[in-house]
Design a protein with these regions (language model features):
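A cross-family structural signal marking well-folded subdomains
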Residues: 1-120
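Generic hydrophobic alpha-helical scaffold/packing signal
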Residues: 27, 51, 67, 71, ...
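A general structural signal for short secondary-structure junctions and capping/turn motifs
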Residues: 39-41, 154-156, 182-185, 198-200
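Short, well-structured alpha-helical interface segments that form or flank functional binding sites
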Residues: 42-45, 65, 160-163, 185-189
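A broadly conserved detector of short glycine/acidic/proline-rich loop/turn motifs that flank catalytic sites
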Residues: 54, 144-145, 169, 174-175, ...
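Substrate-binding/catalytic groove segments of enzymes
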Residues: 60, 200-201
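Intrinsically disordered, low-complexity N-proximal targeting/linker segments that flank membranes
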Residues: 78-166, 173
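Short beta-strand-alpha-helix junction that forms the catalytic/metal-binding core
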Residues: 163, 175-199
Length: 201
């Protein structure tokens, strides 16, 4: 914060347009990943390095190869839960390493050092978890359909049908079957659904 307050006006004006372009590209990139609302954003802190990287890349971010690597970096940050602490040092490393990776150099540490444990899925129960939000977005990105309408969750359906993450097997049914809340409230028993479909279920 202090660094921003100490920023001279001339330096701000020099990078103002580039910073804005980076943020606009970041929003487009997130929409490609089916992340449409701030409430569904795994890490707000990851937007800063994402915008800086996209500003640095310019229009080259639109190339399939670059986008695939950017998605790999982004999801590793989310599922490695790397932007929850020590954000400044992680951001600085990513802003330096990711553009070099896109130009043929070594993988950034955010990609090369991450290990995701599958048993972690059982402990994701609330929106406070970045990985919980990430699973929801990935389900939509990978082609999840609404059970009632059969529609995929593009941005039109997402907003028009009031899509949110809901239980697959209803809580009451799970209780009747003797299934514990630790299981039925985890991300394993959740999927995106429209408001109406969820009400019918």
């Amino acid at each position: 914060r202090q660094a921003l307050l100490n920023l001279p006006l001339a330096a701000y004006k020099q990078y103002e347009k580039l910073a804005e372009e980076g943020l606009v590209r970041a929003a487009k990139f997130l929409h490609l990943l089916h992340i449409y609302r701030i409430a569904d954003l795994p890490y707000q802190t990851q937007i800063v390095p994402l915008a800086a990287i996209l500003a640095d890349l310019g229009d080259a971010w639109e190339h399939d190869t670059h986008r695939a690597k950017l998605q790999c970096w982004y999801w590793n940050g989310v599922f490695g839960e790397l932007y929850g602490s020590a954000v400044e040092s992680r951001s600085a490393k990513d802003v330096m390493e990711v553009p070099l990776w896109l130009r043929g150099r070594a993988q950034p540490s955010t990609v090369s050092e991450v290990m995701f444990r599958a048993d972690r899925l059982k402990t994701m129960r609330m929106r406070l978890s970045a990985a919980y939000k990430g699973v929801n977005a990935l389900l939509m990105k990978e082609g999840a359909h609404d059970w009632r309408s059969g529609q995929k969750f593009d941005h039109i359906v997402f907003f028009g049908e009031n899509v949110d993450i809901h239980h697959i097997f209803p809580q009451d049914w799970c209780r009747q079957q003797g299934i514990k809340p630790a299981v039925f409230d985890s991300i394993i028993n959740k999927t995106p659904l429209s408001f109406r479909t969820n009400r019918i279920i």
